[in-house]
Design a protein with these regions (language model features):
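A well-structured
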Residues: 1-281, 290
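Active-site-adjacent "gating/activation" loops or surface patches in catalytic cores
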Residues: 160-172, 282-335
Length: 335
């Protein structure tokens, strides 16, 4: 099914909340591992139906942050998602603490329970209000960045459409483009500062309410880091400083000489050749189709995956106004 044809229906909070509560009660009352497994199959259906609706709304909102319908849906989920997440975590906690956990580990694996442990450690009913505020702030930030309108070279660009000018071969044009880029951020600096300040205070308050010293540990749980910890990351940062930074300095020095510059500037970032970076050949659509050909030649598995994505119009890779910045991959369980 093509993405544009996938039906969307807003998640009914009251109905879904009652389903989670009923399933949680049944988990606690289960008399065997087999019964618990049957309950968990029902949980999958409720959870996947909820997540698919939320994900479809999110993708369509991110594709056009100015769309009033999906903007309203985003606001709805900013409010209801933390409450539903709390109820889903209650279910996971009951499953995690079940006397039939070993049976379930054989069914769904230990990693699933490690993920549940992270969810339990990062969710509490007492922080729902703070999570709702956090969602509203991140939505405000994403809309602000996506709605950038920067006059340049006879057109109005957003941040993505301005990017080719930031890395072009004409250094004067690059400087002008970077100035336009910076000027835009100065016009929204106060709003960005306010969002950042509120987010730091909000996330710190969430962490404190959960019994952590600061947001770091809570953030690790939220990002589901179940195979490494803060000490591993500290060691990685040390290696970056000791090994990668000197290496990067040598690479940038080579680049400086190649560009014929006395000193590299921020306007030379991601510029690798004096005559300009290599330009992709063909239109954006032709480049995407070339990618499809490459993946077809790589393996039968990558061909099947890429063809499925193309046939069902599941890629959204072209820049346009009001589209959310950045990129991501997500999952639709029922499609």
């Amino acid at each position: 099914m093509k993405f544009k044809d996938m039906p969307y229906k807003r998640v009914d909070y009251d109905k879904t909340a009652e389903q989670f509560k009923t399933l949680t009660k049944r988990v606690k009352e289960a008399k065997s591992g087999e019964e618990l497994w049957e309950i968990h199959q029902e949980y999958y259906k409720v959870y996947q139906n909820m997540m698919d609706s939320m994900t479809i709304a999110e993708i369509r909102h991110d594709g056009n942050t100015a769309d009033p319908f999906y903007a309203a849906e985003k606001d709805y989920y900013d409010e209801t998602a933390p409450m539903l997440s709390s109820l889903a975590t209650d279910y996971q906690r009951a499953l995690y603490e079940s006397p039939y956990r070993s049976f379930m580990e054989e069914k769904i694996g230990r990693v699933a329970f490690a993920t549940m442990d992270n969810a339990i450690k990062s969710m509490d009913e007492s922080i729902i209000g703070l999570m709702q505020e956090e969602n509203a702030l991140t939505t405000q930030y994403n809309k602000l960045i996506a709605s950038a309108k920067i006059p340049f070279d006879g057109q109005v660009c957003n941040l993505s459409l301005l990017r080719p000018y930031l890395t072009g071969n004409d250094r004067t044009v690059r400087r002008q483009a970077w100035k336009a880029y910076s000027d835009y951020f100065m016009t929204v600096a106060d709003e960005l500062d306010d969002i950042y300040d509120k987010l730091v205070k909000n996330r710190t308050a969430q962490a404190k309410a959960m019994g952590y010293d600061n947001y770091i540990q809570l953030g690790y749980y939220r990002m589901n880091r179940n195979s490494y910890d803060r000490n591993d990351v500290e060691n990685f940062r040390r290696q970056v400083k000791e090994v990668f930074v000197p290496f990067a300095e040598r690479v940038h020095e080579i680049r400086r000489k190649r560009l014929g510059l006395e000193k590299l500037s921020y306007i030379d970032n991601e510029v690798y050749f004096k005559e300009g970076n290599p330009d992709p050949v063909g239109t954006a659509q032709e480049i995407l189709e070339s990618g499809q050909k490459m993946y077809a030649e790589l393996s039968p598995e990558t061909k099947e995956f890429f063809d499925f994505m193309m046939e069902n119009e599941l890629f959204d890779v072209f820049g346009r106004k009001d589209k959310k910045q950045g990129g991501y991959m997500t999952y639709l369980y029922q499609y």
